[in-house]
Amino acid sequence: MKGQQKTAETEEGTVQIQEGAVATGEDPTSVAIASIQSAATFPDPNVKYVFRTENGGQVMYRVIQVSEGQLDGQTEGTGAISGYPATQSMTQAVIQGAFTSDDTVDTEGTAAETHYTYFPSTAVGDGAGGTTSGSTAAVVTTQGSEALLGQATPPGTGQFFVMMSPQEVLQGGSQRSIAPRTHPYSPKSAAPRTTRDEKRRAQHNEVERRRRDKINNWIVQLSKIIPDCSMESTKSGQSKGGILSKACDYIQELRQSNHRLSEELQGLDQLQLDNDVLRQQVEDLKNKNLLLRAQLRHHGLEVVIKNDSN
């Protein structure tokens, strides 16, 4: 947003600018900052000043003072500036309005034109056109900001304002130090994509080749173990699928044989138990037979055992 203000010279010889109004175009919604008080305008018709906003934000400026003695003693191309304390600073909010091409002010002038910049304070008043009571808005003039940047401010002259971005203010003539990088920047020198792809493809092919070799070796081992599936038949045209199929059949046959053998083994164990019981019974009967024979001899009876050949 761009606005225009009028100035008035006080009795103390300090050049001050009263609260101004916003120049509006065809947009009726543009809101004025404050009413213009009757005062003499700038004697120089080339004097221009603008409100500059970034990203549609609010304009903030600080109350400063330009002494008459400093203005009389300065040469063309320089400007002496002193600042008020932070407690005397004021804020003013500016509402953005639409401007036509006729209302715009050309801010890019020659080196002889005087430009004005409003510097921000720490707070912004609520509402459009809200100002702090009893404070006035002052303007900073400059003719050559590049020349002022290289000069140090004499002691006791207060703050030093630079005509650039409102956030960039150098105090006491000291230069602002730039924070170093946390880590040095190293540009990436990546190899061409084709070389990277070829390397990845070659590595993938090598892995696949090793995997195929392992599978082939395992199939050869199976062909040696499975009956009727020797290397000769494999070389004569036996496919890998046929070898694997025979391996599956052979494994199924082995499982069935193992199950059958386990059942037969359980039957043998049962027969062994039965045989042990029968053997014990035979031993008991033999002992009883011997006792009976002894009793018969004791009573004078002779026992004759006849073997029937029939």
From Swiss-Prot:
Keywords (A to Z) from UniProt: DNA-binding, Isopeptide bond, Nucleus, Transcription, Transcription regulation, Ubl conjugation
GO cellular component: nucleus
Coiled-coil zones: none
Cross-link (Glycyl lysine isopeptide (Lys-Gly) (interchain with G-Cter in SUMO2)), chain numbering: K306
InterPro entries: bHLH_dom (IPR011598), HLH_DNA-bd_sf (IPR036638), USF (IPR051732)
Cell compartment(s), UniProt: Nucleus
Domain of life: Eukaryota
Gene Ontology molecular function, alphabetical: DNA-binding transcription factor activity, RNA polymerase II-specific; protein dimerization activity; RNA polymerase II cis-regulatory region sequence-specific DNA binding
Pfam families per UniProt: HLH
Biological process terms in GO annotation: positive regulation of transcription by RNA polymerase II
Location of the bHLH domain: 199-254
Species name: Oryctolagus cuniculus (Rabbit)
Descriptive protein name: Upstream stimulatory factor 1
Polar residues biased stretches: 1-17
Region span, Disordered: 1-26, 171-209
Subunit structure as annotated in this protein's UniProt entry: Efficient DNA binding requires dimerization with another bHLH protein. Binds DNA as a homodimer or a heterodimer (USF1/USF2).
Function: Transcription factor that binds to a symmetrical DNA sequence (E-boxes) (5'-CACGTG-3') that is found in a variety of viral and cellular promoters. Regulates the expression of the surfactant protein-A (SP-A) gene.
